[in-house]
Curated annotation (Swiss-Prot):
InterPro entries: DNA_methylase_N6_adenine_CS, Mlase_EEF1AKMT1/ZCCHC4, ZCCHC4, Znf_GRF. This is rRNA N(6)-adenosine-methyltransferase ZCCHC4. It comes from the Eukaryota. The keyword Iron does not apply. It comes from Mus musculus. Zn(2+) 3 binds at residues 378, 381, 391, 398.
Length: 512
């Protein structure tokens, strides 16, 4: 999954996305024992408006997956009391928004479909559905594809049209070049199982590769797109919302994921995730830590110090935010391309190149990047870098993030982009036509003009973030209701400041 380039360019300076651009943050509930209300996409997240570091007094619940209320119009004030009639109507609405076929029905239909002769295997492009003979009359006027082969069934991402709504799915799929590289790299690194979170095309590539002689890897796809339910059996796909750790098919699906992660005491498995870039980093980090905790449950005591290997695929300018929550992660120079997005394809120079990178806790010296695509090994950094990424003797690192050769600024004491110059007014490097310090510049948290939000001393550090996760882990052991536990995690504000617990006790009076 990915997001449109026009959004990415505007986000590069901030290092966060989606609601944050409009001054909205994920918040902790005033009452930690209250479960989050449900929308069609599972438990909602709690948000609060922030203006120059000051939180509005009234928080609200909104959908975790959809950033546009046209796609999911759920809205509820945190302190709002709903009547039984409204709660009942909401439950009915949530049920109506679910897919027309259950997971069990999809599996039953799939098993029947593959038994049909080739001439009777049809796919409705209009409804995005595999058709059985009994369905033909109902879909007679629709656009159909006939003679669906076994090979086509193995590549559903090529049968299904991408969900390209920018603010909801932003479903851009790995290009074959990147997909084959990732699958080959995972095999070279010796992994036998891959948990693909929001990476359907990699899931397909691994399954196709496993059917040959090259690799015996297995894959489990977790994805919010219900259309994949009709192409996979129980052990290959779970419908899942990565922003709130919600399994749409309940405990049975959760157990599938748990068994997959804990097989062989958790050895030989890696998680590869490709979240929508418009999503907030904090909820994703909380979800991934829950998957890590699930994996750790299956480990022996001798392996308790080990980390679940992860490939998190995201734009390079989210580096500081990701490393805040996962300090052991590093960013690789490899540029990940997307098939159905012209600006995410491999280019020959600088800004034509994809901004998408791999963040991982796998040691970078173990990861070989293809020399034929312009990568070389830096003996000083002990990792592969892009050809233009030159080693800086002052920084003692290959510093480029975007594929261009960066220049060292002695005043800033770091390397900067070649298009930037040092501004004496701002005392930092920036684009030549930037606006100097003013009301629109500075920190979104504390209002100071000498730094951005991502570098604010008041924002939670990785230590604080991990401590907060531990706090919610403690609550998880105390509480038994899984949906309630998910609400606790999903309503977490990781960037708490020194006033954190006092903010929780503030009374809510008005909303501006």
């Amino acid at each position: 999954m990915a997001a449109p380039m026009d959004c990415l360019e505007s986000l590069e300076g901030d290092g966060d996305a989606g609601r944050r651009a409009s001054g909205v943050e994920v918040a902790l509930p005033s009452n930690p024992t209250a479960p989050a209300p449900l929308c069609p996409h599972g438990p909602t997240l709690l948000f609060v408006k922030v203006n120059q570091g000051k939180e509005e007094t009234r928080k609200f619940y909104a959908c975790s997956a959809c950033r546009d209320r046209k796609d999911c119009n759920f809205f509820q004030w945190e302190d709002e009391k709903l009547s039984e009639a409204r709660l009942a109507a909401r439950e009915i609405h949530n049920q109506k928004c679910q897919p027309p076929l259950s997971r069990a029905q999809c599996i039953e239909r799939y098993l029947s479909f593959i038994q049909l002769p080739l001439a009777q295997r049809k796919f409705c492009q209009s409804c995005q559905q595999l058709l059985l003979p009994a369905d033909w009359r109902e879909h007679g006027t629709h656009q159909l594809s006939a003679d669906i082969s076994v090979a086509q069934l193995g590549r559903p991402s090529q049968l299904l049209y991408p969900l390209e709504n920018k603010k909801t799915h932003a479903q851009y799929l790995f290009a074959d070049r990147s997909c084959q590289f990732l699958a080959g790299l995972l095999a070279t690194l010796g992994f036998s199982r891959v948990l693909c979170v929001g990476a359907p095309r990699l899931h397909e590539q691994i399954r196709l590769t496993a059917s040959g002689e090259r690799s015996g890897m297995r894959s489990l796809l977790l994805d919010i797109d219900f259309r994949y339910s009709q192409f996979y059996l129980e052990g290959s796909f779970c419908r899942y919302n990565m922003f709130n750790h919600h399994f749409f098919d309940g405990k049975a699906a959760l157990e599938v994921c748990k068994e997959f992660l804990q097989e062989e005491e958790g050895k030989g498995v890696i998680m590869v995730t490709d979240p929508p870039f418009g999503g907030l980093v904090e909820p994703l980090a909380i979800t991934f830590k829950k998957l890590i905790a699930m994996w750790k449950e299956g480990q022996s005591q001798d392996d308790s110090h080990k980390e679940l290997p992860i490939f998190w695929i995201f734009p390079y300018f989210f580096e500081s935010r990701i490393c805040q929550f996962f300090p052991s992660f590093c960013m690789l120079d490899y540029q990940v391309d997307y098939d159905n997005h012209a600006l995410y394809k491999h280019g020959k120079t600088g800004r034509k190149q994809s901004p998408v990178r791999i963040f991982t806790n796998v040691p970078p010296n173990k990861i070989i990047l293809p020399s034929e695509e312009g990568y070389r090994f830096c003996s000083l950094c002990q990792r592969y870098v892009s050809r233009e990424n030159q080693h800086c003797v002052h920084c003692n690192s290959c510093t480029s993030k975007d594929g261009r050769k960066w220049s060292h600024c002695f005043l800033c004491k770091k390397c900067v982009k070649p298009s930037w110059i040092h501004c004496n007014t701002c005392n930092r490097c920036a684009l030549p036509d930037h606006s100097c310090l003013g009301p629109k510049d500075g920190c979104f948290i504390c209002g100071a003009l000498d730094h951005k939000r991502s570098n604010c001393p008041n924002i939670g550090t990785s230590w604080r973030a991990n401590k907060l996760v531990e706090f919610f882990g403690f609550l998880e052991k105390r509480l038994l209701m899984s949906s309630f536990l998910g609400a606790i995690y999903r309503s977490t504000k990781l960037s708490e400041d020194s006033e954190f617990f006092r903010v929780l006790n503030r009374s809510s009076h008005h909303y501006v």
